[in-house]
């Protein structure tokens, strides 16, 4: 069979298979074109989730008849004036969208440029292009796509129900709307208004936060922490939700690079890493992150739909995201999501919350087979003894008061953020009075976080006990892998892992952190090498150490069912106020719930 050139129509249909996967893909391309045209308002109308009709109208700069003829040709664009594929300043740049859509659907363009006396219309059907004809239309452009995939009926079999396709289209518009709060967006389907995002004016930060709240929900703003960090020319701004304000999926993670919505696995992984010890494994944080960096530091031309990007220094970006979010979370102190109050009122029958109760991962009770217990650290050992057994040189915890000391009432001011302890319920929950209501604290969850943060402090200060291996482990990694690991030997040694080069393509492990016990050394080092190859950095060792610290904190903290005196309860409250991330335990469960006097009066019908 001889080699031949494919006909243009088939070439466009092949391109459409990459660019236009579903109606939402066409919506994305058309709305991005409208944004690039300088529109201040963009209206999207669908029918049957976009399968029978997609209409996008804008008030942008418009196109002349000659420009319309070029716009439906492959690789014709106005967005690369200098033929520079590196410093791209527009959302679209390939000139593929309109010809690709026109090859698989019935496409009609109607446009009127600024200053023109009339508008023109052009039709493309199954790749066949007509001629521009006069039309009536205000300044701007309207593009109609009818019968999507009629020219490639096999693609129709892969579309979902109209409602599902509408959901995908709405998500596209929401993400683009968040990146451009100064533009008004609307979405309708079958005559029903689905989205109506008014343009936001005023101070840019406030306008952006208001638009995000429009999309995510009004509860986001009071439960979000502002981010603003910069490192080596890369700037990160945005908001990160409190750990106790979370979702069942990652759908509420909004990521933007130079104003472009992306779903980049490096960024998603960095977000997950930042929340690793404050969120349950089956829960996902709510974030809106905006990365700004020099265009030549990021390649946006690596994905057919431009949904992914590639960073020149991925380790820098990952480190910036993790560091900025962790810094914001630490600054939140004991703060917990305001939605917990609504959940609590709902559970009490007050009807104060519309949100379903959050789900938190179940964690098992201590097991005697844990390496920590085998090392002689009992699940209920006093805190000071447990920490000394770890080899972390931390100050011992305050001693537990003897029973006779528990009789005094204890004095504390209700003006403290977490108030003054008044009672203990079922030897498990502390009830504290605040200036404007009360706080209920889960004593085990709260103390678990306090212990964990003390253990983490030992890790960050390099106070990690090591144990030498009787028989050093030789790990074959290949030349590249061994070079990456030995290059980071100094950083690893600070975490208790001592590694040396051992001939071509191999390393030898001489000491490991005492915390790891009899962990799989070979597997650990291979994981380190893999992460270094992919990201330029590795958190495998740190994550394993933190996991063990979390287990120890769970085992070594005050248990439910233990009676505390009022002074002990107040001491716990004061330590919570001074400890980062104390609004949730290591498993992501909230440590306390606040009820205002107004909330309590609602329960009794006083308001």
Curated annotation (Swiss-Prot):
What's a Pfam family this protein contains? HATPase_c_3
CDD domains to which the protein is assigned, alphabetical: HATPase_MutL-MLH-PMS-like (cd16926), MutL_Trans_MutL (cd03482)
Q: Which InterPro entries match?
A: DNA_mismatch_repair_CS, DNA_mismatch_repair_MutL, DNA_mismatch_S5_2-like, HATPase_C_sf, MutL/Mlh/PMS, MutL/Mlh/Pms-like, MutL_C, MutL_C_dimsub
Arranged from A to Z, the UniProt key words for this protein are:
DNA damage, DNA repair
Which superkingdom, per the lineage?
Answer: Bacteria
Coiled-coil portions: none
GO BP, sorted A to Z: mismatch repair
Query: What GO molecular function annotation could you give as one example from this UniProt entry?
Result: ATP-dependent DNA damage sensor activity
Example of a GO cellular component annotation carried by this entry: mismatch repair complex
Q: Which HAMAP family match?
A: DNA_mis_repair
* Function of the protein: This protein is involved in the repair of mismatches in DNA. It is required for dam-dependent methyl-directed DNA mismatch repair. May act as a 'molecular matchmaker', a protein that promotes the formation of a stable complex between two or more DNA-binding proteins in an ATP-dependent manner without itself being part of a final effector complex.
Q: Family, per the entry?
A: Belongs to the DNA mismatch repair MutL/HexB family.
The protein depicted here goes by the name DNA mismatch repair protein MutL
The source organism is Paramagnetospirillum magneticum (strain ATCC 700264 / AMB-1)
Gene behind this protein: mutL
């Amino acid at each position: 069979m001889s080699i031949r050139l494919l006909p243009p129509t088939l070439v466009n249909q092949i391109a459409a298979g990459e660019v236009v996967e579903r109606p939402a893909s066409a919506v994305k391309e058309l709305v991005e074109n409208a944004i690039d045209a300088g529109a201040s308002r963009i209206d999207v109308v669908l029918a049957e989730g976009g399968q029978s009709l997609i209409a996008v109208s804008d008030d942008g700069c418009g196109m002349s008849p000659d420009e319309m003829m070029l716009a439906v040709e492959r690789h014709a664009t106005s967005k690369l004036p200098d033929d520079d594929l590196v410093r791209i300043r527009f959302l679209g740049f390939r000139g593929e969208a309109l010809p690709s859509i026109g090859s698989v659907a019935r496409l009609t363009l109607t446009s009127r440029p600024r200053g023109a006396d009339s508008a023109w219309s052009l039709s493309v059907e199954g790749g066949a292009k007509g001629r521009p004809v006069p039309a009536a239309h205000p300044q701007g452009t309207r593009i109609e796509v009818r019968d999507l995939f009629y020219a490639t009926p096999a693609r129709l079999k892969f579309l979902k129900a109209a409602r599902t396709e509408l959901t995908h289209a709405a998500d596209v518009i929401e993400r683009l709307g968040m990146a451009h709060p100064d533009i008004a967006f609307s979405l309708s389907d079958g005559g029903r208004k689905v989205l109506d995002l008014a343009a936001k004016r005023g101070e840019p930060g406030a306008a952006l936060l208001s638009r995000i709240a429009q999309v995510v929900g009004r509860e986001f703003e009071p439960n979000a922490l502002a981010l603003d960090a910069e490192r080596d020319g890369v700037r990160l701004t945005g908001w990160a939700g409190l750990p106790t304000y979370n979702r069942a999926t990652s759908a509420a993670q909004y990521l933007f690079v130079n104003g472009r919505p992306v779903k980049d696995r490096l960024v998603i992984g960095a977000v997950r890493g930042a929340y690793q010890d404050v969120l349950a494994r089956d829960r996902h944080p709510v974030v809106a992150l905006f990365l700004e960096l020099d265009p030549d530091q990021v390649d946006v031309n690596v994905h057919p739909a431009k949904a992914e990007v590639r960073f020149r220094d991925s380790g820098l970006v990952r480190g910036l995201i993790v560091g900025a979010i962790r810094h914001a979370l630490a600054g939140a102190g004991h703060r917990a999501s305001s939605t917990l109050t609504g959940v609590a009122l709902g559970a009490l029958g007050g009807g104060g919350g519309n949100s379903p109760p959050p789900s938190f991962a179940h964690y098992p009770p201590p097991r005697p087979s844990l390496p920590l217990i085998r090392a002689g650290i009992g699940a209920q050992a006093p805190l000071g003894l447990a920490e000394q057994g770890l080899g972390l040189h931390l100050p011992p915890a305050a001693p537990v008061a003897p029973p006779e000391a528990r009789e005094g009432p204890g004095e504390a001011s209700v003006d403290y953020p977490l108030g003054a302890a008044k009672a203990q319920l079922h030897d498990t929950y502390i009830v504290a009075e605040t200036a404007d209501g009360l706080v209920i604290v889960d004593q085990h969850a709260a103390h678990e976080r306090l212990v964990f943060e003390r253990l983490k402090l030992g890790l960050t200060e390099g106070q990690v006990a090591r144990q030498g291996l009787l028989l050093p482990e030789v790990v074959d990694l290949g030349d590249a892998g061994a070079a990456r690991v030995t290059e980071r030997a100094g950083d690893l040694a600070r975490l208790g892992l001592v590694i040396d080069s051992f001939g071509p393509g191999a390393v030898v492990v001489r000491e490991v952190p005492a915390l790891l016990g009899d962990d799989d050394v070979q597997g650990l080092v291979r994981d380190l090498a893999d992460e270094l190859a992919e990201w330029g950095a590795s958190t495998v060792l740190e994550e394993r150490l933190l996991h063990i610290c979390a287990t120890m904190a769970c085992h070594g903290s005050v248990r439910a069912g233990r009676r505390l005196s009022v002074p002990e309860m107040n001491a716990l409250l004061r330590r919570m106020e001074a400890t980062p991330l104390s609004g949730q335990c290591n498993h992501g469960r909230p440590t306390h719930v606040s009820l205002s006097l107004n909330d309590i009066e609602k329960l009794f019908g006083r308001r």
